[in-house]
C-alpha cells in the first residue's frame, strides 16, 4: 500500500507553519506528512469494506493541516498517525464505484442507541466522535483506524458509501462531497424568497454554494466576491447575479439593497472611510473563514440578518460589537446529513449533491490531477489554486501501477 501519512510531530508542525506562512502549500515539504509504503491495513471491524480510491480531492481542511494552520480545537478529535483525504470516489472489490460520505457517525462506530443528532439524521453533529469501536476522528481522513483517500486503499463502513451512477465520470463523482457541503450551507441560510444573499469567496466551496443557492433557494439577488478572473467567470455561470472583488463588496451590497453607509472618521482618515452599512444583505455566506471575511460579513448583513460560516476558520481576531448591536445570527455550516427543503421535504444532502453535480456540470471544477508521488507539488497547486486559474486539485490513483506497489 502507498499512502500519505500525517504524524504527531510538534517540531515539524512548527516548521510547516513557518513555511506555509511564506508560501501556501509549502508545509508539505517541511511538515509531519510523508509518503509511505507498507502492508495493507486491517479492517476496523467485521462490517467494514475496502475501498480503492480512483480520485481523491484536496480540501481546504487538508491544506490547513499541511501548513500548520488547523485549529487546536481538533486535536482531541483526531487519532495519529492518520491518512488524509475525505473527498473520494473509489472501487469496491467487485469494481463497482462508490462515493464516500466521510462522517464517522454512531452507525459506523457501532454505537446503539445513536446520539440525538445521529438519530435525527444530522450525522455531522455526532456526539460520539471519540467513542465506539474505532479511534477518535470526526471523519475518514482524520482517524487512524480507517485510513483515508490519499492512499491506494482504505476502509469504509457501508453506511458511508453511495453508489455512483454509470453516467457519472470520476471527475463528477469526486465533486459530490464538496457539493454536499455547499448545499448544506445554502439551506442552513434560510434565505427569504426574493431576499439578497452575499457569498464571500469563489474558490471551490464558494462556487458550489452559489450553484446550490441558485438551484435550491429563491433569492432575488446573489452577490459574490471573487479575486481572480476564472473565479469571476465561473461564479457568474453558476448563478451569481453580481460578481465583485472583495474590496467592492460593501459598495455593491449598498447599491443593491439601497441602504445608507456610515463613515468612520479617524486621524488616519479625517474625511471618513465607509466601513459599514445601516442595512445590508438578508444573508451572508462566508466561504473563506478569515478575520477579514467575517468582519466584512458583520459589516454588510442587515440588522436581524444571518451570517453562515462555511469556510473553516482558525484563530481569528474580531470586533463583535456589530453582532450584538445589529442582533445578527452567526451560525456554522459543517458537513451535511439530512436537509429540509423550502417545501418541507426532507432528503439526504448527498442525494441533492448527486442531482446538483449532474445538473450544473460541476465536474468542470476539477482542474488538475496528480499522482501521490507528486504530493508536494499537488498540495502547493491546491493552496495557490485561485492565482493559478484552478479550483479543485485531486490525486489520481486510477493507474494500477499506483495501486500495486512492489
Which residues make up each language-model segment?
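Adenosine-nucleotide cofactor-binding segment
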Residues: 199-202, 207, 214-292
Amino acid at each position: 500500500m502507498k499512502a500519505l501519512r500525517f504524524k504527531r510531530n510538534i517540531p515539524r508542525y512548527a516548521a510547516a507553519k513557518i513555511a506555509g506562512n511564506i508560501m501556501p502549500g509549502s508545509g508539505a515539504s517541511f511538515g509531519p506528512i510523508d509518503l509511505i509504503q507498507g502492508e495493507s491495513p486491517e479492517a476496523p471491524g467485521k462490517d467494514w469494506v475496502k475501498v480503492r480510491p480512483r480520485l481523491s480531492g484536496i480540501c481546504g481542511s487538508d491544506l490547513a493541516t499541511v501548513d500548520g494552520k488547523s485549529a487546536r480545537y481538533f486535536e482531541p478529535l483526531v487519532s495519529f498517525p492518520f491518512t488524509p483525504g475525505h473527498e473520494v470516489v473509489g472501487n469496491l472489490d467487485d469494481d463497482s464505484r462508490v462515493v464516500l460520505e466521510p462522517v464517522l457517525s454512531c452507525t459506523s462506530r457501532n454505537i446503539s442507541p445513536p446520539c440525538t443528532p445521529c438519530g435525527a439524521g444530522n450525522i455531522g453533529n455526532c456526539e460520539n466522535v471519540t467513542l465506539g469501536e474505532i479511534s477518535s476522528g470526526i471523519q475518514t481522513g482524520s482517524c487512524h483506524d480507517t485510513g483515508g483517500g490519499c492512499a491506494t486503499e482504505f476502509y469504509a463502513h457501508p453506511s458511508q458509501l453511495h453508489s455512483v451512477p454509470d453516467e457519472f465520470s470520476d471527475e463528477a463523482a469526486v465533486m459530490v462531497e464538496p457539493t454536499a457541503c455547499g448545499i448544506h450551507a445554502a439551506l442552513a441560510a434560510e434565505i427569504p424568497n426574493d431576499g439578497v444573499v452575499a457569498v464571500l469567496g469563489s474558490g471551490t466551496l464558494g462556487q458550489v454554494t452559489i450553484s446550490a443557492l441558485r438551484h435550491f433557494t429563491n433569492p432575488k439577488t446573489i452577490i459574490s466576491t471573487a479575486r481572480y478572473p476564472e473565479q469571476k467567470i465561473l461564479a457568474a455561470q453558476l448563478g451569481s447575479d453580481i460578481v465583485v472583488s472583495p474590496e467592492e463588496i460593501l459598495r455593491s451590497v449598498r447599491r443593491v439593497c439601497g441602504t445608507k453607509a456610515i463613515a468612520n472618521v479617524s486621524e488616519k482618515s479625517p474625511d471618513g472611510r465607509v466601513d459599514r452599512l445601516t442595512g445590508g444583505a438578508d444573508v451572508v455566506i462566508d466561504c473563506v473563514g478569515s478575520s477579514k471575511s467575517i468582519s466584512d460579513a458583520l459589516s454588510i448583513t442587515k440588522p436581524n440578518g444571518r451570517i453562515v460560516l462555511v469556510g473553516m476558520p482558525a484563530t481569528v481576531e474580531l470586533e463583535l460589537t456589530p453582532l450584538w448591536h445589529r442582533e445578527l445570527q452567526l451560525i456554522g455550516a459543517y458537513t451535511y446529513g439530512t436537509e429540509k427543503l423550502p417545501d418541507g421535504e426532507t432528503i439526504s444532502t448527498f442525494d441533492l449533491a448527486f442531482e446538483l453535480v449532474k445538473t450544473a456540470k460541476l465536474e468542470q471544477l476539477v482542474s488538475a490531477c496528480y499522482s501521490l508521488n507528486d504530493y508536494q507539488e499537488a498540495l502547493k497547486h491546491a493552496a495557490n489554486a485561485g492565482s493559478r486559474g484552478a479550483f479543485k486539485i485531486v490525486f489520481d490513483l486510477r493507474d494500477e501501477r499506483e495501486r500495486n506497489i512492489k
